């Protein structure tokens, strides 16, 4: 089992399985127990399994608009086109019609992602063979330019919910790995992109606590500003990554996935000042919401541990609140990662019981 930027690749699977609960199903058990030496192989294995399951259910189809010149009417007659045909002495009708088709955006994204993985030399032959077999059922589906995919416009509904995890894996793959060469070809770069891994890291922590600690209220909630006059024009939204609460006890976790957990100035290591300012602001404004009630609101900056020699491990008492700065070592067997996360809860919420 190898590492990708100090994260065991199989641990990335565990992180994905919390972010996307579909991967917790028994049908993915063989992927969960396999040891991966490349991130590309993990992604290929997940997609091969997921696409296979989707094929058993049937590929999603939707109505696609077409315009064709036909000898018999289909759908609606397009008058301008038909008149033009008459003037050119063509005995055909221009027709507009909708056709139920597999050649839609969701299937195009799957095929495009698979084709990128098939062209990558680091993907093992067994995964490529599996993906190639799946692609035989995509003969009527077009590949598209990866850079032209408008992820924010994709909408899921009741009859295509099974695509949600697959498309998310595709987005993670394409956005995190895609580089265009001068020749206009695409190649896959290092998987770990800080910004995208940070989102996965946040989601993983949130979903882990949500699943295993039902006694706690777990959310990524917004905190209102403690305003004296109620005027908050142009103030930024205070959006927490992880907000844990039981009664009047609150822990706000700010999850950070950085290449460097500290900043260096004149050979002196210090904590990232913006991160400290942010968590302190969150804590004090959250505490204000309790009014005159007794409360304990704490904050924690939780960095993904790097290979740097100096790692933060600090607890501060600031203006009546505890602010801690810790690291989560993702380069360990997953059971030990879980133990680290459990200790965080146990140190802030007495008597809390973990659920399986």
Regions found by a protein language model. Give the residues of each.
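A short, highly charged nucleic-acid-interacting micro-segment common to nuclease
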Residues: 156-160, 186-205
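Generic alpha-helical propensity signal that fires on short helical segments
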Residues: 61, 65, 69, 188, ...
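Catalytic core segments in nucleotide and nucleic-acid processing enzymes
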Residues: 194-356
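Terminal, charged accessory segments of proteins
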Residues: 1-186, 356
